Swiss-Prot record:
[4Fe-4S] cluster binds at residues 62, 66, 69. This is Biotin synthase. It is an enzyme of class 2 (transferase). NCBIfam families: bioB (TIGR00433). Homodimer. Belongs to the radical SAM superfamily. Biotin synthase family. SMART domains: BATS, Elp3. Keywords: 2Fe-2S, 4Fe-4S, Biotin biosynthesis, Iron, Iron-sulfur, Metal-binding, S-adenosyl-L-methionine, Transferase. The gene is bioB. It comes from Clostridium botulinum (strain Langeland / NCTC 10281 / Type F). Catalyzes the conversion of dethiobiotin (DTB) to biotin by the insertion of a sulfur atom into dethiobiotin via a radical-based mechanism. Binds 1 [4Fe-4S] cluster. The cluster is coordinated with 3 cysteines and an exchangeable S-adenosyl-L-methionine. It catalyses: (4R,5S)-dethiobiotin + (sulfur carrier)-SH + 2 reduced [2Fe-2S]-[ferredoxin] + 2 S-adenosyl-L-methionine = (sulfur carrier)-H + biotin + 2 5'-deoxyadenosine + 2 L-methionine + 2 oxidized [2Fe-2S]-[ferredoxin].
Length: 318
C-alpha cells in the first residue's frame, strides 16, 4: 500500500497526520497526490464551494515593510493611495457581488491596524450592509485589539482575516516591522471575540516546502476555518520584483499537501491566479474548495461569471 493511500485512510478515519508522515509523501507523484487530496476534500467537505470577493477599502501608505506588498510606504510602487472608501461605494460593491453569486465579501485595509475613527466608520458601514444584503461579511484590518474585533462582530462581521504569510522561521526574511506573534495574538483575539478565522499565506516568496508545511501546521493549531493560498505575483518596485514565479506543479503540490494537513478547512485559492496557465482549474482539482474571485487589492483577478462557470463545470456546488 502506498503512503498516499495509507494516510488517506488515516485521515478519513478522523485522525490527523504528523509532520513526519507528511514528509513521507513529499516525493510522491504529483498527479496521485492531487487526486487523493481531492478525494479527501470530497469525502470530508463535500462539493460545496465557498466563493468570496474583496474590496480595497483603504489603499497604500502602509508603514509596515512586507517585501511582497505594493502598498508599503517603504517601496516605490505605482499604486493609487486613498483613505477609507465611503459607505455607499462599499455597500454597492457588496450588493453587486452578491447578485453575481458570491457568498462572502471582505473589506481589506492597508496599514498595521485601523485607528478608532476608522473602525467606527467601517462598523457603521457593516451595520448598514447587514441590513441591506445577505452576503456574509468578512474583514481584514490588520493587528486590531480585542475590543475593536468585538465591535466588528457586533456590527455584523462573521469572519476575520489575518494571514500568517509564511512560517515563523521565514517570516523575518519578509517583514521586520511586526512580529509573527503579533499575528497569532490577533487571530486568538478574533476567535475570543466570536469571529471565524481566515488565515493563510503567500507561496513563492523564496521559502521552502518545509516552511509551507510549518505554516500549515501552525494554522491547524490555531483551528482556522479558511486558509487562503496566494501565489506571489511579483510587483515592480518591491524587493521581490524579480522573484522567480513558482511552477504550476509546485503550486498544485502545495495545495494538495495542505489538504492532507488540514482535511476539513476551506482551502481557498487566492491571489496570483492570473499568472498560472488555466486560471487555476487544475489547482481546484487538488483539494481546494474555495476561491477569491474578481480583482485583488492591487492586481487584476478573474471575472466572477467566468469563475462560477469553471467551478460548476468541475462538479462543485456554488
Amino acid at each position: 500500500m502506498s503512503n498516499i493511500i495509507k494516510y488517506k485512510k488515516k485521515i478519513l478515519n478522523g485522525d490527523l497526520l504528523t509532520k513526519e508522515e507528511v514528509e513521507e509523501i513529499l516525493e510522491e507523484d504529483i498527479t496521485d497526490l492531487a487526486a487523493t487530496a481531492n478525494e479527501i476534500r470530497e469525502s470530508l467537505c463535500g462539493n460545496k464551494f465557498d466563493l468570496c470577493t474583496i474590496i480595497n477599502g483603504k489603499s497604500g501608505r502602509c508603514q509596515e515593510n512586507c517585501k511582497y506588498c505594493a502598498q508599503s510606504a517603504h517601496f516605490d510602487t505605482d499604486i493609487i493611495e486613498y483613505n477609507i472608501l465611503n459607505s455607499d461605494r462599499i455597500i454597492n460593491s457588496a450588493i453587486s457581488n452578491y447578485n453575481k453569486g458570491v457568498h462572502r465579501f471582505s473589506v481589506v485595509t492597508s496599514g498595521r491596524a485601523l485607528n478608532n475613527n476608522e473602525v467606527d466608520t467601517l462598523c457603521k458601514t457593516y451595520s448598514k450592509l447587514k441590513e441591506t444584503c445577505s452576503i456574509r461579511l468578512c474583514a481584514s484590518h490588520g493587528l486590531l485589539k480585542y475590543e475593536d474585533l468585538k465591535r466588528l462582530k457586533d456590527s455584523g462581521v462573521t469572519r476575520y482575516h489575518n494571514n500568517l504569510e509564511t512560517s515563523r522561521k521565514f517570516f523575518t526574511k519578509i517583514c521586520t516591522t511586526h512580529k509573527y506573534d503579533d499575528k497569532i495574538e490577533t487571530i486568538k483575539n478574533a476567535k475570543k471575540a466570536g469571529l471565524e478565522i481566515c488565515s493563510g499565506g503567500i507561496i513563492g516568496l523564496g521559502e521552502t516546502m518545509e516552511d509551507r508545511i510549518d505554516m500549515a501546521f501552525t494554522l491547524r493549531e490555531l483551528s482556522v476555518e479558511s486558509v487562503p493560498v496566494n501565489i506571489l505575483n511579483p510587483i515592480k518596485g518591491t524587493p521581490l520584483e524579480n522573484q522567480e514565479i513558482l511552477s504550476y506543479e509546485e503550486i498544485i503540490k502545495t495545495l494538495a499537501l495542505f489538504r492532507f494537513i488540514l482535511p476539513t478547512v476551506q482551502i481557498r485559492l487566492a491571489g496570483g491566479r492570473t499568472i498560472i496557465s488555466d486560471n487555476g482549474k487544475k489547482a481546484l482539482e487538488s483539494g481546494v474548495n474555495g476561491a477569491i474571485s474578481g480583482d485583488m487589492l492591487t492586481t487584476l483577478g478573474i471575472e466572477t461569471s467566468e469563475d462560477i462557470k469553471m467551478i460548476k463545470n468541475l462538479g462543485f456546488e456554488v
